[in-house]
Amino acid sequence: GKLAIRVDAQGWGGGDARQIKTVLEAVAGELLSKFPGRPLAPIRVSRSTQAPVALYERGPGGEIRIELTASGPDAGPYVYEFSHEFCHVLSNYERHPHHAVTRNHQWFEEALCEVASLYTLKTLALSWQKAAPSAELAAAARQLRTSVQTLESATHAAWSTGVPDDALANATPYLQAFGH
């Protein structure tokens, strides 16, 4: 069956919870299509002022809890953040021992989840251009393409020297701007 996603009704800074739910369902549908038959508990999505996160602690009904910092009516930040956090869920993040960050390998999961965000932004931009779930999201296709271009140019700029430490220093403002 379809993955159940519940979005908190309030706190989205002008974003409509029903529209946000439609966006998140599109993200989940795209990524879950790569994991046929993968069962998942329902997901509850809330707004956070701290950082986007897939929480280790389940909700009272056993639901997976994801917090996003995205707000407002633009779909791009929701696609980007939810893709990243949902990727953590799909990569069995909850199996880390005592939910400790696995320092030696966490970078790989983070890189994979960034790729998932870029992939989903690109894929939804293309599919919404042809057949969006709503008129508002048809208009958002261009904005998603712009988000992809911004992220890709920031990545290229960050690696301009070819030195990993420089890349991290150059990427820090971009990561902070996108909630990391």
Listing of model-derived features with the role each one plays in the protein:
Residues 154-180:
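Pan-zinc metallopeptidase signature
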Residues 2-73:
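Auxiliary, metal-adjacent structural segments of Zn-dependent hydrolase domains
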Residues 20, 24, 79, 105, ...:
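Hydrophobic (often cysteine-bearing) scaffold residues that line and stabilize catalytic clefts
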Residues 103-155:
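Post-HExxH zinc-binding segment in Zn-dependent metallohydrolases
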Residues 65-82, 96-105:
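Short pre-active-site segment immediately N-terminal to the catalytic Zn-binding motif
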Residues 79-97, 110, 114, 118:
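Active-site recognition of the HExxH zinc-binding catalytic motif
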Residues 29-36, 91, 95, 117-126:
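Sec-exported extracytoplasmic/periplasmic mature domains
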Residues 13, 17-20, 24, 133, ...:
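Intrinsic-disorder-associated interaction segments
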